[in-house]
C-alpha cells in the first residue's frame, strides 16, 4: 500500500531527527534489543495513530523491527511533521499523514490505515477507536485490542465502557504511573512552555499566567510557569484540586475573574468551552491564549471569530490576532490546537521514552493475553510499571535501595 505524505524528498531531515531521538531513548533501545530478533509481533498488522514526529516515528520503527506490519497516521492535523513522515515512508513503513491536513483528509487517512485490517492499535485521543465503533465496525472481529495514550482518549473510552459499548479490550496507558507522573506532568509542563515561548518570543517572568485545569498536565504547566517567574492563577471545577493548587502556592478563582488578570492563558482540561465569549471581552489587550489539551475545543475559536471586528490576521507564524469590539487584541497560538506540537516538537525525548516503552509493553501484553481479556478498559499491571521504572533509573545512572529480609517481613507482618 502506497503512503500518502507531503513529499518523500523531505526524508533526509526526518532521518536526522529520528537518529537524534534514538540516542536518547534507552528504554526503546533495550526493548528493541530484547525482542527484535524474536520477532514477537511477527506478521501482525498494527495501526499507530499518534502525533507524528521523531519520537513516535522511532516507536513505529521499533514495533516494525519486532515483526509488526506497521501503518502510521497522525492524531492531530497540526502535529504531523512532514519530514518525519517522509523518513518513515522511506524506511518501509506505510504512512497516511500530512501537516495541516483538512478534516476530510484526516478522516481519510484514518480510514486508509484501517483498510489494513489491524490486529492491534495504538490510539492518541480516541479518533481511531471512534471510527472503529461507528463506520468501520466490520473490522472489530479481527482486533485483539489496543491502547490509548492520552487523558482525553481515556475519557472517551470510559464513556464507551460505562455505556457497555466498548467492543474490544483497550489498555489505558495514560493511567499507568510511568506515564502520567512523568509524561503528563513534566512532559506537558516543559513542552507547552517551549511552544509558547518559541512562538511568541515574549518574557514569562513577571507576567500573570492563568492555567485552566489542575490535573497532572495542569500541575506541570503551573509548576514550569512558576519556575519561569510568573504569577500563576489556577481555575478548576474540582474543589479538591482547587485546594491542591492553593497549597502549592497559587491563586485559585473562577475563569470569569481570572480573565481580567491573565497575560497568558493555558487550557489543560480535556473539556470544551473553557474560554468563551463570556471571557474574551474581559481580557487584557495583547492577551495570549494557548491550549495544551488534545482537541481544539477548550478555547472557543468560533466565538473569537464571531466577535472580532476586524479580519483575523497572522501577526507572526502560529499567532492569529483577533480584535474585540472594545479595541483590545487577543492572540491565539496554533489555531487553538495542542500548543506543544502545533508550535513545537512535543514532549522531551527522555520523557516519551517512558511513555512509549509502556505502549510497546501494552501491545506485548495484549498479544500474550489474546482471547483472555473482556471488552473492557484495563491498566497495565503494576509489575510492568516497576520494570520500566527500574530500567529507566539504570539508564539515568541512578539507583535505589532494596529491602532487607527483615524489613520485608516487618512491612508484611499480619
Annotated model-derived regions:
Residues 12-25, 41-45, 53, 168-206, ...:
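Adenosine-phosphate binding glycine-rich loop
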Amino acid at each position: 500500500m502506497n503512503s500518502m505524505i507531503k513529499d518523500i524528498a523531505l526524508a533526509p531531515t526526518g532521518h536526522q531527527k529520528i537518529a537524534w531521538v534514538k540516542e536518547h531513548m534507552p528504554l526503546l533501545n533495550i526493548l528493541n534489543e530484547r525482542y527484535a530478533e524474536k520477532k514477537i509481533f511477527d506478521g501482525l498488522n498494527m495501526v499507530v495513530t499518534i502525533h507524528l514526529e521523531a519520537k513516535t516515528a522511532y516507536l513505529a520503527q521499533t514495533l516494525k523491527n519486532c515483526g509488526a506490519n506497521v501503518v502510521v497516521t497522525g492524531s492531530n492535523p497540526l502535529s504531523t511533521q512532514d519530514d518525519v513522515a517522509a523518513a518513515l515512508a522511506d524506511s518501509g513503513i506505510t504512512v497516511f499523514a500530512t501537516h495541516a491536513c483538512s478534516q476530510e483528509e484526516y478522516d481519510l487517512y484514518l480510514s486508509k490505515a484501517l483498510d489494513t485490517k489491524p490486529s492491534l492499535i495504538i490510539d492518541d485521543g480516541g479518533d481511531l477507536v471512534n471510527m472503529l465503533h461507528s463506520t468501520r465496525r466490520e473490522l472489530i472481529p479481527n482486533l485483539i485490542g489496543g491502547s490509548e495514550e492520552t487523558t482525553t482518549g481515556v475519557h472517551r473510552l470510559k464513556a464507551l465502557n460505562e455505556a457497555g459499548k466498548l467492543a474490544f479490550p483497550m489498555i489505558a496507558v495514560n493511567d499507568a504511573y510511568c506515564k502520567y507522573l512523568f509524561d503528563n506532568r513534566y512532559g506537558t509542563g516543559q513542552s507547552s512552555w517551549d511552544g509558547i515561548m518559541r512562538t511568541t518570543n515574549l518574557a514569562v517572568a513577571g507576567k500573570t499566567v492563568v492555567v485552566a485545569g489542575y490535573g497532572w498536565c495542569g500541575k506541570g504547566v503551573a509548576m514550569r510557569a512558576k519556575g519561569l517567574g510568573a504569577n500563576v492563577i489556577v481555575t478548576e471545577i474540582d474543589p479538591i484540586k482547587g485546594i491542591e493548587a492553593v497549597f502549592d502556592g497559587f491563586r485559585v478563582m473562577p475563569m470569569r475573574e481570572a480573565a481580567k488578570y491573565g497575560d497568558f492563558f493555558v487550557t489543560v482540561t480535556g473539556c470544551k468551552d473553557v474560554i468563551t465569549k463570556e471571557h474574551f471581552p474581559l481580557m487584557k489587550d495583547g492577551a495570549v491564549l494557548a491550549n495544551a489539551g488534545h482537541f481544539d475545543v477548550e478555547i472557543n475559536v468560533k466565538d473569537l471569530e464571531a466577535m472580532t471586528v476586524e479580519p483575523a490576521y497572522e501577526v507572526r507564524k502560529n499567532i492569529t490576532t483577533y480584535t474585540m469590539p472594545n479595541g483590545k487584541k487577543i492572540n491565539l497560538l496554533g489555531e487553538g490546537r495542542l500548543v506543544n506540537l502545533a508550535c513545537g516538537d512535543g514532549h522531551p525525548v527522555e520523557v516519551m521514552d517512558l511513555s512509549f516503552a509502556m505502549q510497546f509493553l501494552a501491545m506485548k501484553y495484549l498479544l500474550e493475553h489474546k482471547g483472555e481479556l473482556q471488552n473492557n478498559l484495563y491498566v497495565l499491571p503494576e509489575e510492568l510499571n516497576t520494570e520500566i521504572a527500574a530500567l529507566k533509573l539504570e539508564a539515568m545512572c541512578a539507583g535505589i535501595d532494596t529491602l532487607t529480609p527483615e524489613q520485608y517481613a516487618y512491612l508484611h507482618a499480619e
